[in-house]
């Protein structure tokens, strides 16, 4: 089976001339001679990117998804190929309704007619991983609720594992033979794709992502996220509240319904930056099919988010890196942008900051001939990632996912309102986040988080030091030196914390006394 699949891949490569694309960059002279022989009599009119896209489409949904993931790696691929791969559509015919019903019944342990009323046999959506049916809950606490039932395609895992094994083999050979193999890191790209696919195969994980996003936006009149009905959720079946809206791409329909389109564009950007800089947790598959607008009078004009299989997460370090980069960029402080890249640890330490600064200036300076509203933050990130190739910068997967999502958000926003000033909308979020992190409030919040742990550690330090010294004396192990250094470092950190707490307490006390004295003088008390 695997051999037959390999043969199909081989003949597809020959058919679309991908061997010419790949082998032309191989260093081995014998391979280049073989290329000259195999290309005799073959002529390809279509550009390389188009041929690659057509080849992936002919190999089936797993390779289509691989191409979609590759399209986000603009730090690795030429722009023309990345743009062409972005056109790949994850659309496949639905599987039989009888199979879907059997899968639901096996997963939930009861007949569909017992669980649901009006289970629609024809799916409303179908993709390579799953398809969706509408239904109504029959009994229990959610009786009468209209729901969407997402069902994982049957026998997906063996197919995926087989294709992934072949992709891993191809990646090994590409890295060994291709001139760009080491820089493009094909094995790492395949490993990233492996994780991405297996995450999508777990619908419980998707339900948890949706539940988290719903909780994050509770109380805000910005985004509607369906409720997950956990009693009906398993790794292969997901049941959630049914939300019906108009796809965001149908602008004329929305305008005719009375939706405020410029306001919708601004709120879309606001939703994105709230996810990124407030929550560090963002919907990373924001194409028009997954983003709709409610026309329900109770939630008129509000966004609806669907499909939570791909979610990005950012650490405080990532958010700080992004915020400072964007702020430095708009101040045209390229030295700061270069320094941030070096401080991140993702640039080789031998890199000269002046050389990196010069390259970043060459990328960014042309943008300032335009109005701020015409500057694409996603394009800025993309150009910076492209520059990173020259300096062997290690781009983090979560930032690549963010850049792809940012391009989607900008595209959606400007399709709604061509005059949308993304920077004007984003800047308050960046500045607010920086103030919260660097100011007194940020210091106090971190203090509250760390203080309990340090208060537990402090009383144990004398015993730990005594134990480490005794063990060192007995065993004379060099490894204990590291332990002692770590303990002493922890003690220094704890001392700094206690000093900070003391100073903070004194400052608060003095402030209270001065405030009381001022009030007494002011009011004669």
Swiss-Prot record:
EC number(s) from the headed UniProt entry: 2.7.-.-
Segments forming domain Protein kinase: 118-500
Chain ranges passing through the membrane: 501-521
Active site: 285
Superkingdom of origin: Bacteria
GO biological process per UniProt: regulation of ubiquinone biosynthetic process; ubiquinone biosynthetic process
Pfam family, one: ABC1
Molecular functions (GO terms): ATP binding; protein kinase activity
GO CC annotations, alphabetized: plasma membrane
UniProt keyword S-adenosyl-L-methionine present: no
Keyword entries, A-Z: ATP-binding, Cell inner membrane, Cell membrane, Kinase, Membrane, Nucleotide-binding, Transferase, Transmembrane, Transmembrane helix, Ubiquinone biosynthesis
Subcellular location(s) per record: Cell inner membrane
Metabolic or biological pathway, per its Swiss-Prot or TrEMBL entry: Cofactor biosynthesis; ubiquinone biosynthesis [regulation]
Top-level enzyme category: transferase
Positions with a binding annotation for ATP: 124-132, 150
Keyword Membrane: yes
Annotated InterPro entries: ABC1_dom (IPR004147), Kinase-like_dom_sf (IPR011009), UbiB (IPR010232), UbiB_bact (IPR045308), UbiB_kinase (IPR050154)
Bilayer topology: Single-pass membrane protein
Function (record text): Is probably a protein kinase regulator of UbiI activity which is involved in aerobic coenzyme Q (ubiquinone) biosynthesis.
Family: Belongs to the ABC1 family. UbiB subfamily.
PANTHER family: CHAPERONE-ACTIVITY OF BC1 COMPLEX CABC1 -RELATED, PROTEIN ACTIVITY OF BC1 COMPLEX KINASE 7, CHLOROPLASTIC
Identification of the protein by name: Probable protein kinase UbiB
Taxonomic source organism: Paraburkholderia phytofirmans (strain DSM 17436 / LMG 22146 / PsJN) (Burkholderia phytofirmans)
Taxonomic placement: Bacteria, Pseudomonadati, Pseudomonadota, Betaproteobacteria, Burkholderiales
């Amino acid at each position: 089976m695997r051999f037959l699949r390999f043969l199909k891949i081989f003949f597809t490569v020959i058919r679309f001339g991908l061997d010419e694309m790949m082998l032309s960059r191989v260093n081995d002279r014998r391979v280049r001679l073989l290329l000259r022989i195999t290309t005799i009599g073959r002529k390809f009119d279509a550009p390389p990117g188009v041929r690659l896209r057509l080849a992936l489409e002919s190999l089936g949904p797993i390779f289509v998804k691989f191409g979609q993931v590759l399209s986000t790696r603009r730090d690795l691929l030429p722009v023309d190929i990345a743009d062409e791969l972005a056109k790949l559509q994850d659309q496949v015919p639905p599987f039989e309704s009888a199979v879907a019903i059997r899968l639901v019944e096996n997963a939930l342990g009861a007949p569909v007619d017992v669980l649901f009323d009006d289970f629609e046999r024809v799916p409303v959506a179908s993709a390579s991983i799953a398809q969706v049916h509408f239904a109504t809950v029959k009994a229990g606490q959610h009786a009468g609720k209209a729901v969407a039932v997402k069902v994982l395609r049957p026998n997906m895992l063996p197919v995926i594992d087989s294709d992934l094994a072949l992709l891993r083999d191809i990646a090994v050979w590409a890295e060994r033979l291709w001139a760009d193999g080491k820089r493009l890191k094909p094995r790492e790209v395949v490993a990233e794709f492996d994780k991405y696919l297996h995450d999508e195969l777990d619908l419980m994980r998707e339900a948890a992502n949706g539940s988290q996003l719903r909780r994050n936006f509770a109380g805000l009149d910005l985004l509607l996220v369906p409720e997950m009905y956990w009693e009906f959720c398993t790794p292969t079946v997901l049941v959630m509240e049914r939300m019906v809206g108009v796809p965001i791409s149908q602008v004329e329909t929305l305008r005719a319904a009375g939706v405020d389109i410029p306001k919708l564009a601004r709120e879309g950007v606001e939703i994105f930056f709230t996810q990124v800089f407030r929550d560090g947790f963002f919907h990373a598959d924001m194409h028009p099919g997954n983003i709709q607008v409610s026309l329900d009078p109770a939630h008129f004009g509000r966004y609806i988010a669907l499909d939570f299989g791909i979610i990005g997460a950012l650490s405080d370090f990532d958010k700080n890196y992004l915020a400072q980069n964007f702020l430095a960029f708009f101040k045209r402080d390229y030295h700061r942008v270069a320094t941030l890249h070096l401080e991140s640890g993702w640039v080789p330490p031998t890199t000269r900051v002046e050389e990196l600064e010069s390259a970043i200036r060459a990328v960014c300076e042309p943008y300032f001939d335009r109005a701020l509203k015409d500057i694409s933050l996603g394009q800025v990130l993309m150009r910076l990632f492209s520059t990173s190739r020259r300096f062997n910068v290690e781009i983090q997967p979560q930032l690549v996912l963010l850049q792809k999502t940012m391009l989607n958000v900008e595209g959606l926003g400007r399709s709604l309102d061509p005059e949308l000033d993304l920077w004007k909308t984003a800047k308050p979020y960046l500045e607010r986040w920086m103030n919260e992190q660097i100011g007194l409030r940020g210091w106090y919040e971190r203090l509250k988080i760390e203080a309990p742990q340090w208060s537990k550690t402090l009383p144990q330090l004398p015993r730990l030091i005594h134990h480490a010294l005794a063990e060192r004396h007995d065993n004379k192990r060099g490894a204990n030196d590291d332990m002692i250094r770590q303990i002493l470092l922890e003690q220094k950190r704890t001392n700094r914390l206690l000093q900070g707490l003391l100073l903070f307490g004194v400052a608060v006390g003095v402030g209270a006394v001065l405030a009381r004295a001022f009030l007494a003088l002011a009011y004669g008390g």
